[in-house]
């Protein structure tokens, strides 16, 4: 099966807000804790082995990486890989820099259509995950959570993790958050949830495709 995301390539790296590219195409950002499997998920969704660099040193990536999607000369959209968060050994100044960069990007980027938030299915909705959601709340844009590494859980543990995450996300809806909040199980290793994630992401990038698939809950 062919997906738009399979036509992805590196575009640019950004380390300061003023360096964000002056593009008009829609963007989807990918966020998550260090070691939540974010780079691996991006690579499997784009059907490439090393599009997003998976560092063996958690917290090493402290900048924003852009990938163009579609035709190289006239991209349809951009995928935006945000720095992993939550690694204790990152120096305080670097951590403060990228937290400021993340929050400013999430709240001010008009091209942004939604966030794909990666959470380790064994430890969903940590305090830092909640902070990321709360940075995004003012935008009213959708957040879709991928509960990664679900292959490491039993079937019942996976069901429980998904239910607990959905319950936690429902708290934001009850508090008045206007954007869609959805979640699904995901495993790059066992290829669980890949087609489901593809369909949702492409419905954000190409609105007319939205009616062709049901949105995960």
UniProtKB/Swiss-Prot annotation:
One of its GO terms (molecular function) is GTP binding. Pfam families: MMR_HSR1. It comes from the Bacteria. Mg(2+) binds at residues 39, 61. GO terms for biological process: division septum assembly. Its cofactor is Mg(2+). GO terms for cellular component: cytosol. The keyword Nucleotide-binding applies. Keywords: Cell cycle, Cell division, GTP-binding, Magnesium, Metal-binding, Nucleotide-binding, Septation. The keyword GTP-binding applies. GTP binds at residues 32-39, 59-63, 81-84, 148-151, 185-188. Signal peptide: none annotated. Residues 24-207 form the EngB-type G domain. NCBIfam families: GTPase_YsxC. PANTHER family: ENGB-TYPE G DOMAIN-CONTAINING PROTEIN, MSS1/TRME-RELATED GTP-BINDING PROTEIN. Belongs to the TRAFAC class TrmE-Era-EngA-EngB-Septin-like GTPase superfamily. EngB GTPase family. Necessary for normal cell division and for the maintenance of normal septation. This is Probable GTP-binding protein EngB. It comes from Paraburkholderia xenovorans (strain LB400). The gene is engB.
């Amino acid at each position: 099966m062919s997906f738009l995301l399979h036509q992805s390539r590196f575009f640019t790296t950004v380390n300061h807000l003023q360096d964000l590219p002056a593009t008009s195409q829609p963007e989807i950002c990918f966020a998550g804790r260090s070691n939540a499997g974010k780079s691996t998920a991006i690579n499997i969704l784009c059907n490439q082995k090393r599009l997003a660099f998976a560092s063996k040193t958690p917290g090493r990536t402290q900048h924003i990486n852009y990938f163009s999607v579609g035709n190289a000369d006239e991209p349809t959209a951009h995928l935006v890989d945000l720095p992993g968060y939550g690694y204790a050994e990152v120096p305080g100044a670097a951590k403060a820099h990228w937290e400021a960069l993340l929050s400013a990007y999430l709240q001010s980027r008009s091209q942004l259509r939604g966030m794909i938030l990666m959470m380790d299915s064994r430890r969903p909705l940590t305090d830092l995950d909640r902070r990321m959601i709360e940075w995004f709340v003012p935008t009213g844009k959708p957040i879709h959570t991928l509960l990664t590494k679900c292959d490491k859980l039993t079937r019942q543990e996976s069901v429980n993790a998904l239910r607990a995450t959905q319950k936690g996300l429902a708290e934001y809806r009850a508090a008045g958050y206007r954007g869609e909040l959805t979640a699904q199980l995901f495993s790059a290793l066992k290829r669980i949830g890949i087609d489901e994630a593809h369909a949702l992401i492409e419905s954000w990038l190409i609105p007319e495709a939205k009616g062709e698939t049901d949105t995960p809950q």
